[in-house]
Curated annotation (Swiss-Prot):
Binding site for substrate: Y225
Lineage, opening ranks: Bacteria, Pseudomonadati, Pseudomonadota, Gammaproteobacteria, Aeromonadales
Activation and inhibition: Resistant to triclosan.
Protein name: Enoyl-[acyl-carrier-protein] reductase [NADH] FabV
Subunit structure: Monomer.
The organism of origin for this protein: Aeromonas salmonicida (strain A449)
């Protein structure tokens, strides 16, 4: 079939298999151009490995460090008449490229919050790799099915304490609007911590430890975002921030646990990027459009791949971790530069529907957004007939 983008809200309901593969190939090429990561990991588990920072982590370790990788994700396959999710095509493309390069790659498609998924991954590690030396935790899910009770808990992207009103972009109409978000109640706050906090990361690390599949000196990293005063009301001071604080709590606990065998665990705070997750957060598309323009002008713009590769090479496996006072690895250092932030603050009040594309990189934002789904890549022929049913070596749970 010939596949065209269909955008609804913050999701594109169609995806392009050839475009997604081209995207993955671009990220692999970038990694290979940068060269190998000295003393990098060799056996890696990525939990949340199919898009965004998780996919970039899998690429960085496999193609930048020659690592064998196991990727866990929850994606939908395509059929002859329906496209798969982008993460399915990304993972298929990664699998193909890894095998071409002679690298071990196994993928598990299932609910990463489930005990069944943990058991399957441990079985794979024992059978194929023995142990692992890096665990990347990069899950972005709005819901979590509790492993013991089966209860489904939903997160809420809301401010805490007071109603938040701000300028935002209606990405469907490309218009500047006033967005109002009501504050969360206590239950919504707790639910968001349950879904997006550090508890599941702890469960994974405990299961891996108890099974004896963590190598001596194993490292673990979980991804977070803090942002700036421009986004704090909806993010860091909101329900998401509470969940991310819980991630910090979990990191401290896991770090204490791994220390006995020379291992370590940290939260890595990353920059804002265009992902399916960030496009769902009010204000983020506008903030990202501004930050992108300024950072591109200053030559300090990074996407997921550049950011993760820099973290792996210069921090996690580099000279020094350069931690903040909460023992976090800060990769948002360039975005938080005062010159970048002040320009954003000055710009924010003056943005209108008319000057949106001129004052910000909203055009770039939209291009990046479509690229997540495999559209808008120059090297892809979008008039060609393609088969949406892409098969690859994946363990289905």
């Amino acid at each position: 079939m010939i596949i065209k983008p269909k955008v609804r809200g913050f999701i594109c309901t169609t995806t392009h298999p050839v475009g997604c593969e081209a995207n993955v190939r671009r990220q692999i090429a970038y990694t290979q151009e940068q060269g190998m990561i000295a003393n990098g990991p060799k056996r890696v588990l990525v939990i949340g490995a199919s898009t965004g920072y998780g996919l970039a982590s899998r690429i960085a370790t496999a193609f930048g460090s020659g690592a064998a990788t196991i990727g866990v994700f929850f994606e939908k396959a395509g059929s002859e008449t329906k496209t798969a999710t982008a993460g399915w095509y990304n993972s298929a493309a990664f699998d193909k490229a890894a095998k071409e390069a002679g690298l071990y790659a196994k993928s598990v498609n299932g609910d990463a919050f489930s005990n069944e998924c943990r058991a399957k991954v441990i079985e794979l590690i024992k059978a194929d790799l023995g142990q692992i030396d890096l665990v990347v935790y990069s899950l972005a899910s709005p819901v979590r099915k509790m492993p013991e009770t089966g209860e489904v808990v939903r997160s809420a992207l809301k401010p805490i304490g007071e109603t938040y009103t701000t300028t935002a972009i209606d990405t469907n109409k490309d218009q500047i609007i006033t967005a109002t978000v009501e504050p969360a109640n206590e239950e919504e706050i707790q639910n968001t911590i349950t879904v997006m906090g550090g508890q599941d990361w702890e469960l994974w690390m405990a299961a891996l430890r108890d099974a004896g599949v963590l190598a001596d000196g194993a490292k673990s990293v979980a991804y977070s975002y803090i942002g700036t005063d421009l986004t704090w009301p909806i993010y860091w001071h909101g329900t998401l921030g509470r969940a991310k604080e819980d991630l910090d709590r979990a990191a401290t606990a896991i770090r204490g646990d791994l220390a006995a065998k020379g291992g370590t665990a940290h939260v890595a705070v990353l920059k804002s990027v265009v992902t399916q997750a960030s496009s769902a957060i009010p204000v983020m598309p506008l903030y990202i459009s501004m930050a992108f323009k300024i950072m591109k002008e200053k030559g300090i713009h990074e996407g997921c791949m550049e950011q993760v590769y820099r973290m792996m090479r210069t921090r996690l496996y580099g000279e020094e971790l350069a931690l903040d006072e909460q023992a976090r690895i800060r990769m948002d250092d360039w975005e938080l530069r005062e010159d970048v932030q002040q320009t954003c603050r000055d710009l924010w009040p003056s943005i209108t529907t008319e000057n949106l594309s001129e004052l910000t990189d909203y055009t770039g934002y939209k291009q990046e957004f479509l690229r997540l789904f495999g559209f808008g890549l120059a090297e892809v022929d979008y008039e060609a007939d393609v088969n949406p049913d892409v098969k690859f070596d994946v363990v289905e749970l």
